[in-house]
Structure formats: C-alpha cells, structure tokens
Amino acid sequence: MLTFDAHLDLSLNALEFNRDLRLPAHELRRREAGMTGKGIGRGTTAFPEMRRGEVGLCVATQLAGCMAGPRPIANWMSSEQAWAQTQGQLSWYHAMEEAGHMRQIKDLRGLDEMIALWTNGQPNDNKPIGYVLSLEGADSIRSVGHLERAWEQGLRAMGPAHYGVCRYALGHDMVGGLPANGKELVQEMDRLGMILDVTHLSDGCFWDALEIFQGTVWASHSNCRALVPDPRQFSDEQIKALISRGAVLGSALDAWMMIPGWIRGKTMPQDVHLKLEVIVDHMDHICQLAGNAMHVGIGTDLDGGYGTEQTPEDLDTIADLARIPDMLAKRGYSTQDIENIMHGNFFRLLRQALK
C-alpha cells in the first residue's frame, strides 16, 4: 500500500552521516562497520528500502539550528551558518532530483503527478520519491522577511522549534510561550500559505501558535502523552485541539516516544521487547479521541540521528512500514481507514495547503 511518511531527515543523513542513500540500507551498514557513534552501522532508511516499502512520497527536512547550549548535531553559532547549511541540504535534494531519485512537490499538480506515478501499477524500482520540503526548527531563517526566500525555494512546511531555546520559539523541553518574533514568524507563514508543523513546540508555544495561525496545521512526528508521559508527546487536550483544526498527527517510531521508561543511550529494544505494533496503540488513541481515523498518519523520524538501537526490535528498515496495514486490520480498521492512515489523511492536508 502506498505510504506517505511525514518526517524523514534525508539530507541530514546524506551530509552529516555521509550516507549515499541510493545504496541499500544494509550496504550502508556494512560500510560503517567498525565506526562509532549513535546510529552508526544501524541505519534504517535509504531509497531502495523506501521503494520496496512503497514509501513513495514523504516530507523531507532541512535541519540546521542555533539552539542555546551544545547540541550533538546540526547546530550552529549563527543563523548565517545555519542558513548556509540548509542551502547545502537543498543542493543535495536537487542533486538527487537531477539523478532521477527524487522529485520536489511544490504545488497541487506536482502532488497529483506523484500520486499517479506511485499508483500506476508499474514496478517501483526506479520511481523517483516525491518530497515536500520542510524545515525542522526555524533558526536558519535569518529574519522574518527572509522566510519568503525559503518559500520561493519550495519550502512548504515548517516547525518553528526543535530542542531548547530556539530563535523564534521554545522547544518541547522548555516552558513558555512564543516571543514577539515568533508570533511574527507564524503570521508570515500564514500569509505565505505555509503549513505549520507544531511538533517540538513547548506547550505554551503550541497554544500561542494555534491562536495566531489560521492555515493548515499538522504534527509531522508526534505521539501521545497519555501513553508516554513526556512533554515531547501531545496531551489529549492538545490532540483534541488539533483534531478541531482538521490536523493530522504523524506517528513516530523513535523508541523513547513509543513506550514509557525508555532511557536513551541505555535501553535497547531487546531489553523491553518493543514491537512495531506498539505504534498502533498511539494511532488508536488518537482515533478514539477523534471518533474516526481521519487525524492520524505516519511520521516515522526513522533516520533522525539514530538507528536500530532506538527502534522496535522487529523493524529492520523503513520497508517494514508495509506491515502496519495488517496490524490495523487486526484492530478492526476498515480498508478505507487504513488507506487514510497510510497516506490519505496527509494527502488531504496537502491538497488543502497546496491549492
């Protein structure tokens, strides 16, 4: 079944981890054998596995922050440096387009063309992967007026924060609302028609942003606080607010977001027997709050700076997303519900935003 993944850090992996994503994931692991570092030799995501799992369309990020305090990856001392990093990431996406492996989706016509390509019944082996460009954390936007330049480059979604104190917002691990420039940024996103990604926002920033922003909203990779008590997840009150706005939440496969008590860098999937099917618990929780299956989708974050040491033990690569439809069917979800979760709900929001 065609799958839309609402959050992949593809360019981060290509440039920060030096991974040629045209190669199979297992070949990338082989090449990293003997190297050290989080996620090294354990990557799950590459183009061949995306094609095999029918992950034909995705949201692909740019990521370069100026977050206060040291961060292990993609964090810079100035917005100018961060902007330059995002431009390098954009250049990589363009190089993959020129090589026939990706195709950027900027408008409704582009979206419909990619959906048609991936549902034409032909083999997927050589199909380009369609991507909607998103920015995870707005620190690289040098000024509010600078956002339009990113829009012209095809940026269609953005989350104002990542971790900690960011230039325009506070991350989920902080307490407080949007500063004045953050409110201006959200207003400019609204004017341009950009999608607001509320993932990673502090609770205060979340509520401020929803009050200001009138356009299309999603949470690209967020799970349920009722199941995993942590500010990184959304409370039922927040989920209900997103449902009332017609939003969709992408379910993430980062292990510490799936079950309570996970200690990053210490707990291993085999220690707690974490299975892929646990993500259906989060999906079902959102569906129960909504009374339907119209507000949840897939947003794996599978390549977000970690690997199989921080994913379900029965997940080898992103191709395993193809097992989720059967898991949903066993829970009583209809074929239409499953199609909506795997791709239809996010497609609906994209059609709304890209019209």
Which positions does each model-derived feature cover?
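Aromatic-anchored, glycine/proline-accented short structural segments
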Residues: 205-245
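Histidine- and/or cysteine-centered catalytic micro-motif in compact active-site loops
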Residues: 201, 222-224, 252-256
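Loop-centered beta-sheet repeat module
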Residues: 175-211, 216-221
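Histidine-centered catalytic micro-motifs
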Residues: 3-10, 201, 219-222
